[in-house]
Each structure stands twice: as structure tokens, then as C-alpha cells.
């Protein structure tokens, strides 16, 4: 790990020509202080959930108040615990770390792996993340441990390295043996750093050689135009008819790219570092001005939390390691930490803004995973950079098109939006929106207006997700929808959608030709229903036009509104009172209704954790046309 620090310094020097000599330089002390305060708040709260004196099978584990069990990946907390033990000198953190790793014997297997959960999921690919956390804890803070504990932890790390070497079906980027497919790419990307680090710790050239092979293979898994890392899904050998491959922003920025950056810096692989740098820049295009990550379109967006991902680690360390030559990375970390703080209630990080207001408890997985991420960047030495660098999406640049994921970002006036026809699917159907969907609409003062959910909510990774405990649930993505004999047909699952973007003076138009289908591409009994939509963006807001809305279909607009916010709804529009203004939805053509809601007048969707008012706009008259206008004043 120390190699990371040296190579990062040399790498920064090689880019020094990009910064003018007169540019002001500052220390990031305030950023680190904010991170440490939040880290301590999280960890001190986590300690209140650590079991003691209950039963030998429970003692040392952290009981999750949302899931009523101990998560098998709780061992990742060993890193922040050891960091705080070293930072504060308080033995409570060291003692908690030792107790925790003793509990981890419950999920430790004879083959050297750690299971994802006790008797819930025997998946052990996550051993790579447990190994990284334990390695960094020993590497940075092993001097705090007695010899017996230190030797035992190192023995487990060596066994974990052997396990990763013997299981290419989990970590390799090459088909071999009886493998049917490659695993999700975040495991391969992360094993490069894990095996290189363990190879150095134990003087194992074979570990380091395998890390080199996987890293070399991974260079072929970046898209041609935009350098998205792909492989978060099974269909990786042939692009879709629209040229897409399975990409997930959340896993890329919170696990894969940071760990690839660590590896590349450790071994001074300049080619890989250049690829990772370009990919990081592309992904940064999707951070909203409030510090949120826009993963409204990714293949694994069923774990999107607005600020990041439910069980992934966090982007801070990898981006921080390269921040000296990219000051925007520091700004991204600062804004995301600010959002994480806002999303923390009673010491726990919640998976979305409206969890607490909707009566949904916080799973502790988000807290300990992102505590690990905060610690990873705090372990690195302070950097110096030009004082301020705006984020790409701060600027009202109009429209940017990302060909490899068939997605457009709109930035006009105070509005930011995402329109997607990304058609690379995950292992299951009905996950991320397709079909020319507006997967996100955001305003500088109003905040998020629309934020896509899965097309239908399901526990795709049951141990890592929360079930819906409220009466009503529906997709939170704007769509044209028809329900027939209990089956939902909409444009969100349509794989046969045409999208045409044109600029008209100071307006941006998206013309969508799509169809109403279910997740299996089946049509209603009457046959295929083509639907034409137009989205028009301007500084004033957005309009949506449905030229002809067939049969019983309607336009569904799930408008994000906290349960405490006041709404005024008529058949011709809706007013939503915000702190600094009013969001207005006007029906120019059509009649507005509200779908059934829970007692608070909202529907809550666990992904990405917002409450919304489910507006339904039905056509009036023979022309079956719908037109709505969205403004904020």
C-alpha cells in the first residue's frame, strides 16, 4: 500500500504542467475533518449494536435493526475500528475490532473464504472485500495488535489469498474449465488490488502474477467511446443492437475503479492508470451538483441509494488517490460527504432521503460499508490542489450524449435530467428503465423531481435489499402505462425504442417512438401499441407530450415529495410547496388523477429511497393527446 503513496506522488508530478504557477493551492484539512467527524458518528453508533453477553454465536457481531440479523460482511468494519483506535487512542475501538473478528469465525470457511451471510447466503465471492478491509487494518494499524491476534489475522489473510487464487470462476476475466459465464466485473477489478497487496505482504509472486493477468485482461473491458467499465451483467461478448454492454455506475465508482486505481498505483502500470483515469472522468459526469450519483440507468440500479450503493464501498479512496492532478475529484468527495451527512439519522446512514419519514428503519450495511470507504481515503496522506474545480454537471452545457450506454444528460438553466435508451439487461428482467425513459429530473432549488426505480420492485439480491413493508408500491419512473388482467405494460421495458435528439434554438427535444410491453417483451392481447412521446427542455422547465395514448393507458408521473411537503392537486395540475419555491405540474391536455397511496398520501419505493405522489394523466377527447408542463418558481 505504501507504493500507492509514492507512485501517486510521481503521477501527480507528471501532470503538474496542467496547473498554472499562479493558481492558489490549499490543504484539504477541512474535508478530512468533516470525514472524520462523520466516521466517528457512524462507528460510535454501530458500537451500540454490537452484541455482548447474549450468546457465543452472537457476541461481537453487529445486529442490524432493519434486517433483524447480523450481516456477514460486517467484518469490513474492522478497518474503521482500527483506524479510530489508532487515531484516538481509545481502547474501545481496538476491543470492538477484536470481538468483531472473533464473531467473523461464524462466516469463515475451511477453504479460507468468508461467506456473505450466516445461513442466508453462502456466496463467498465477497471474500475479496473482506480481505481488502482486513489487509488495510493490519497494514496500517497492525502495531496495535498483540502477536497472537496479528498472526491469526495474517493467517486468515493468507488463506483468503489462496482461496482467490483457486476460484477463477469468481474473479478471472477468462473463461476456463467448466465456467458458464464470467462473474460480475467488480470482483475481478477488486481482486487485482487484493492479490497484489497480499502478494507483497506474504512475498507471494504467484499472487502478484495473477493480479497482473487479471488487470491485463480488464483493459479490454472498457467501452470504446466513453471508457465505461463493463461486465455488470452476463451478456458481455456481444453488444445489444444499440451498441450497449452491461454497465453499472454504482459498482464501477464505488468498488471497481477505486480498486483498479490502487492496483495500478502499486505496480506503476501507467497504461491501466490512464484508462482508469479516463473512466473516472466519464463517471464523474454523472454526479449531480448536490453530490448524488446518478445511477438511474445502470444494470444494477436495484441497489441505487441516490448517494451511492446499498452494499458497495464508496468512491472516495480511489478518487482521492488521484485528486492532486484532478481537483474536481476533491470537490466530488466533499459534496458526497455532505450528502452522506444529510442522509444520516440517529447515527446511521439511510438508503434514501425518505426512509425515516416513511417509517422504514435503516440497514446498517450502508453505514459500515461507507465507513470503510471514508477510512480508505483518510488513510492516504493529504493532497494539495487548486482551490476549487467545479463538477461537470454544475455547468449548463445543454446536452451530452454517451453513446456506449445510449444515454443523454441534459443541463439547461437550473434543470438537470437524464434520458435513457440503455438496453443492456441484467440477469433478471424488469430492472433498470429503458424505452426512452426520463430516468432523472433534478432542479437546483427543488432537488430531485423524478428518480427512476426498478421497473418492478423485487428482492433481486434478497440478503442485500429491504422488502417493502407498506401497502402500496409502484415504479418511480415516468412512463406510459397500461394494466391489463393484472399485467403492467409500459415503455420502460421496451427493447425496440427509437430516440432522436434535436436542438431547437434554446430548447432540447427528444422524440421517442416506443411500445407498451411487459418485462418479457410481451404485448397486450390486442397486439403491439406504438407510443410517441416528446420531451422538450428549456431554462423554464420541461414538457412531456404523448401524441396518442391508447385504450386505458395513461401517463404516470411519480413526483418526488417528502411526506411533510404540502401538495395541492386538481384535475388540471399539482402544486408542490418547496422551501424556496413551488414546483408546478400543469395539464395542458389531459385529466389528472392520483393513484392509491398510503395514509401519508405517498408511495415509497426503497430504491432509491424517495416518497412520491403518483400522478396519472389520462387523455381527454378523441385525439387521445396528453401534454404536461413542469416548472419551478
Regions found by a protein language model. Give the residues of each.
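Beta-strand-rich recognition/accessory modules
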Residues: 19, 589-633
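Extracellular polysaccharide-recognition and catalytic grooves
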Residues: 68-72, 132, 136, 158-397
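Surface-exposed beta-strand/loop patches in extracellular or lumenal glycoproteins
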Residues: 551-565
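Low-complexity, Ser/Thr/Pro/Gly-enriched N-terminal "stalk/linker" regions
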Residues: 22-76, 83-113, 158, 162-165
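Solvent-exposed beta-hairpin/edge-strand motifs
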Residues: 561-588
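Bacterial Sec-dependent N-terminal signal peptides
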Residues: 1-22
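Catalytic and substrate-binding regions of extracellular carbohydrate-active enzymes
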Residues: 362, 372-552
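Well-ordered mid-protein domain cores that form the structural environment of catalytic cofactors
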Residues: 120-171
Amino acid at each position: 500500500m505504501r507504493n500507492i503513496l509514492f507512485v501517486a506522488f510521481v503521477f501527480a508530478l507528471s501532470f503538474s504542467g496542467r496547473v498554472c504557477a499562479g493558481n492558489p493551492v490549499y490543504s484539504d484539512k477541512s474535508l478530512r475533518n468533516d470525514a472524520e467527524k462523520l466516521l466517528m458518528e457512524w462507528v460510535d453508533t454501530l458500537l451500540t449494536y454490537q452484541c455482548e453477553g447474549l450468546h457465543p454465536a452472537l457476541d461481537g457481531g453487529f445486529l442490524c435493526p432493519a434486517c433483524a440479523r447480523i450481516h456477514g460482511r460486517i467484518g469490513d468494519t474492522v478497518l474503521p475500528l482500527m483506524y479510530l483506535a489508532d487515531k484516538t487512542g481509545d481502547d474501545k475501538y481496538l476491543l470492538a475490532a477484536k470481538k468483531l473478528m472473533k464473531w467473523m469465525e461464524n462466516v469463515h470457511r475451511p477453504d479460507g473464504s468468508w461467506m456473505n451471510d450466516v445461513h442466508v447466503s453462502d456466496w463467498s465471492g465477497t471474500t475479496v472485500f473482506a480481505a481488502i478491509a482486513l489487509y488495510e487494518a493490519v497494514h496500517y494499524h497492525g502495531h496495535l495488535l498483540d502477536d497472537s491476534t496479528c498472526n491469526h489475522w495474517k493467517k486468515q489473510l493468507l488463506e483468503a489469498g489462496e482461496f482467490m487464487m483457486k476460484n477463477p470462476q469468481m474473479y478471472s476475466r477468462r473463461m476456463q474449465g467448466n465456467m458458464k459465464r464470467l462473474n460480475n466485473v467488480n470482483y475481478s477489478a477488486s481482486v487485482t488490488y487484493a492479490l497484489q497487496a497480499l502478494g507483497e505482504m506474504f512475498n507471494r509472486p504467484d499472487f502478484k502474477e495473477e493480479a497482473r493477468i487479471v488487470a491485463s485482461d480488464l483493459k479490454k473491458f472498457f467501452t470504446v467511446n466513453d471508457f465505461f467499465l463493463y461486465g455488470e451483467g452476463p451478456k458481455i461478448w456481444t453488444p445489444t443492437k444499440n451498441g450497449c454492454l452491461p454497465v453499472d455506475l454504482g459498482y464501477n465508482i464505488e468498488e471497481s475503479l477505486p480498486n483498479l486505481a490502487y492496483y495500478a498505483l502499486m505496480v506503476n502500470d501507467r497504461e491501466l492508470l490512464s484508462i482508469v483515469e479516463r473512466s473516472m472522468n466519464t463517471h464523474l459526469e454523472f454526479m449531480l451538483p448536490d453530490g448524488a450519483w446518478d445511477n438511474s440507468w445502470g444494470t444494477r440500479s436495484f441497489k441505487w441509494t441516490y448517494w451511492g450503493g446499498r452494499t458497495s464501498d464508496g468512491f472516495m479512496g480511489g478518487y482521492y488517490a488521484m485528486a492532486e492532478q484532478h481537483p474536481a475529484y476533491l470537490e466530488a468527495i466533499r459534496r458526497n460527504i455532505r450528502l452522506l451527512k444529510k442522509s444520516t439519522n440517529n447515527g446511521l446512514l439511510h438508503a434514501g432521503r425518505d426512509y425515516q419519514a416513511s417509517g422504514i428503519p435503516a440497514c446498517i450495511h450502508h453505514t459500515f460499508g461507507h465507513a470503510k470507504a471514508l477510512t480508505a481515503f483518510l488513510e492516504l496522506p493529504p493532497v494539495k490542489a487548486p482551490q476549487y474545480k467545479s463538477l461537470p454537471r454544475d455547468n449548463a452545457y445543454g446536452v451530452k450524449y454517451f453513446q456506449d450506454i445510449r444515454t443523454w444528460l441534459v443541463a439547461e438553466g437550473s434543470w438537470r435530467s437524464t434520458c435513457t435508451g440503455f438496453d443492456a439487461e441484467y440477469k433478471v428482467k424488469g430492472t433498470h428503465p429503458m424505452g426512452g425513459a426520463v430516468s432523472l429530473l433534478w432542479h437546483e432549488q427543488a432537488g430531485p423531481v423524478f428518480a427512476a426505480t426498478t421497473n418492478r420492485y423485487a428482492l433481486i439480491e434478497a440478503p442485500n435489499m429491504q422488502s417493502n413493508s407498506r401497502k402500496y408500491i409502484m415504479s418511480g419512473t415516468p412512463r406510459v402505462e397500461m394494466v391489463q388482467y393484472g399485467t403492467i405494460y409500459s415503455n420502460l421495458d421496451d427493447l425496440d425504442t427509437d430516440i432522436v435528439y434535436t436542438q431547437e434554438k434554446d430548447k432540447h427535444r427528444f422524440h421517442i417512438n416506443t411500445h407498451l410491453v411487459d418485462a418479457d417483451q410481451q404485448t397486450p392481447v390486442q397486439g403491439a401499441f406504438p407510443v410517441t412521446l416528446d420531451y422538450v427542455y428549456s431554462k423554464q422547465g420541461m414538457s412531456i407530450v404523448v401524441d396518442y395514448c391508447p385504450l386505458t393507458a395513461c401517463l404516470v408521473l411519480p413526483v418526488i415529495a417528502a411526506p411533510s411537503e404540502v401538495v395541492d392537486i386538481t384535475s388540471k395540475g399539482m402544486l408542490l410547496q418547496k422551501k424556496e419555491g413551488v414546483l408546478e405540474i400543469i395539464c395542458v391536455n389531459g385529466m389528472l388523477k392520483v393513484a392509491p397511496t398510503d395514509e401519508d398520501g405517498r408511495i415509497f419505493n426503497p430504491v432509491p429511497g424517495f416518497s412520491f405522489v403518483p400522478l396519472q394523466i389520462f387523455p381527454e377527447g378523441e385525439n387521445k393527446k396528453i401534454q404536461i408542463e413542469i416548472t419551478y418558481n
